[in-house]
């Protein structure tokens, strides 16, 4: 489906003048952000359409009830169009950025005045092919450009800026088809569909009236009959959520819960979540030494991170020795499982401490005696009493006799000694024990008391 435009409309210069005025208004709209480099408004000098545009309707959908609305997909083709605009720019970039630049970075210039340059930009041989969605309603026409193919020739009065401006225009051309042209077409269609007898001064009043009609109230989305189909349980939940969030306070409205919304942790309740995490400090502080709960929360608690609580035993628990190693191991294992929940192969690193007591000489002697008593069978043998000779003077003593230093009254001689492996180590460290007595060299005696080199006699 296609149709032709009226050639008389494009042949008359009034159409081009109307397009020029609308385009100038759109480019100088107060809602647009004005660039600092522009020292004046943008003026559209000339608009020309020597070739009549072509419009091909690809799809059309007309809805008469309940609203009069026509939807269509169209293909627009335009050739040999021309556009010329003029403005004034500021060439002194130091003056533009003076307000936003710190004073210590600005050089001390002799003259930092304004230097404006008038510039004229001409777009010629404009060729446009676009696929558009058109919505036709009583107030006007709304159009949106989906697929745009644009080509043009650009000429600038300042040749040194021509390449830079052309590159930036091609990069920002999507803004023209997204915002400028749709608003221009809509405003033109509003003026076109209104009665010719009415003045243009009544158009803003009608636009405000149309805006008031299209403003949606609360009852537009849900009517009174729609509330009967809603679940009362869902409505109760929604009302509780809304009431819990209708506050500007940093503290929670419900002090006994972690969050007013299930599954959502709020910032003001973070310290409660941290206090319930398994740690040595939290466990022993809550069990053995309970602290009074207060409804007020300090600012330090709100911003205090988890690592500041220190996974350590409180000093009072250490002083009173009220800790349990099994409980500590369980808490540390839970902390390890929480931190390595994604890694199944991770194993905790246990610190093993071997407790070894240092052996004193008294302990060594007692352990050696106990080992010998347990591992050896000792038979008590009465020793032969020996009369201790009376020491004489040094001149009267025979040369082959010597007095002993000391003689023990009782000495036990083991007949059979069976040593264990453990007792060998201990007995090797013991000092040797010797029996020292008289050594008789007479041939009449068949025995002699043992010295260091010879053992005592056995009977």
Swiss-Prot record:
Its domain description in UniProt is: Lacks alpha-helical transmembrane segments, suggesting that it resides in the membrane via beta-sheet conformations similar to those predicted for other outer membrane proteins and porin. The SMP-LTD domain is a barrel-like domain that can bind various types of glycerophospholipids in its interior and mediate their transfer between two adjacent bilayers.
Q: Which family does it belong to?
A: Belongs to the MDM34 family.
Biological process (GO), any one: mitochondrial genome maintenance
Name the residue ranges with Basic and acidic residues bias. 338-347
Q: Which GO terms describe its cellular component?
A: cytoplasm; ERMES complex; mitochondria-associated endoplasmic reticulum membrane contact site; mitochondrial outer membrane; mitochondrion; outer mitochondrial membrane protein complex
**Mostly located where?**
mitochondrion
Q: Where in the cell is it found?
A: Mitochondrion outer membrane
| UniProt keyword annotation of DNA damage present | no
- Protein name per its UniProtKB record: Mitochondrial distribution and morphology protein 34
The gene is MDM34
Annotated Basic residues bias: 348-359
Molecular function (Gene Ontology), one example? lipid binding
